[in-house]
Amino acid sequence: MGYIELKNAAIYYEIYGEKNRETIVLVSGLNTQMTRWELSFCNQLVEEGFCVICFDNRDCGKSTFTTDRSNDIHSFSLNDFLRHPEKHTAPYSLMDMADDIGDLLHSLGIQRAHIVGRSMGGIIAQLFAYKYPALTKTLILLMSSSFNPALPKADDALIRKMTSSTTSFKDNKPTFIKEKIDFMKAIYGNQFSFNEEKECALIIEDECRKSSLIKPFRQIIALVSYKYDPDVLHSLHVPTLVIHGDQDPLFRTEHAVDLRNNIPNCELILKNGMGHAIPEALFPSLIKDISAFITK
C-alpha cells in the first residue's frame, strides 16, 4: 500500500498477491471507494493466480486532488455548471483519471495489465485502453456504458438519489446511512439477498477512511462533461469482455449491447438478476468469467 504523488493528485493504492504474476487493475465508479472491490473478491482473484491492484480514484477515499482557485468547486455549484457549462472549466476530466492509471502502472514498474472497470470506472477503463493500448492486455467492463446519449437513461428520481443527499454523515449519521441504503436497495436487483448490516458497515468505513479534502461534485462534473466519441470504442483492439446485469436500472442492458456491438473483439455476458451492484453471491461466477477470459 502507498501513494503516488502527481502534479495535482495523490493516488492511494493497495496490492494483493505477488507482483510477478499477471496483474489486474480494478477501477472504481463514480465517487466509489476501492473498498467496494471487497477484500474477499480481491482475495479470490489472488487465489486464481493474479496480482490485484486496487486504488482510490482522485477525489475519492484516500486519494486527493488539488487545484488552483479559478477551478475550485466552491467557486460555482453543480447546478451552475449544468446550466452554463460554457462559463466554467471542469477541474479534471475522465481522461485525466485514465492518465492516473497510467501513472500508477509506471510508478509500480508494471509494463502491461488487465484493466477491470465498474460503472463509471468502465468508461475510465475504455479511455485508458484507447490512450494506452500498449499497456492494456485485456479490458473487462462491469455494469458500464459508452455514455452514448442515444441509449436509455435512468429514472430521474434514481439519479437524484445517487447524486444528492439531504444531510451529511457528520450532521445526521442515521439519515445519511438510510439514504445510502435506500439507494443501494433500488439498484441491487431482486435475485440476491441484500445484507443491510454489511452495507451499513461499508458506509461507515468509507466515511471514516476518506480524506477531508475530497469534493464529490468534481467527479460528477467530470462525468457529465464527458462527450461520447464512437471512435473511442471503434479504436479498441484489445480483447474486451462486457459483464452486465439484466436488472441494471442505471445502465440498462442496451448499454451493454452497445458496447458489444461497437468494440471490436468484444464478448458479452449477461447476469440474470444482477442490478447495478456486485452481490457477494456472484463473486465466484464473476471470478470464473474474468479468469477464463484473461487466461484463454
Where are these predicted regions, by residue range?
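Alpha/beta-hydrolase
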Residues: 154-231, 238, 258
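Acidic beta-to-alpha connecting loop that harbors the catalytic carboxylate
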Residues: 30, 246-248, 273-275
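Conserved alpha/beta-hydrolase "acid-adjacent" motif
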Residues: 249-255
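Short beta-strand/loop motif that positions the catalytic acidic residue
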Residues: 236, 242-244
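Conserved hydrolase catalytic core segment
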Residues: 111-151
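Catalytic active-site module of serine/aspartate enzymes centered on a nucleophile-bearing elbow/loop
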Residues: 266-296
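Conserved HGGG/HGGXW glycine-rich cap/lid loop of the alpha/beta-hydrolase fold
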Residues: 9-83
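Conserved acidic catalytic loop of the alpha/beta-hydrolase fold
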Residues: 91, 95-113
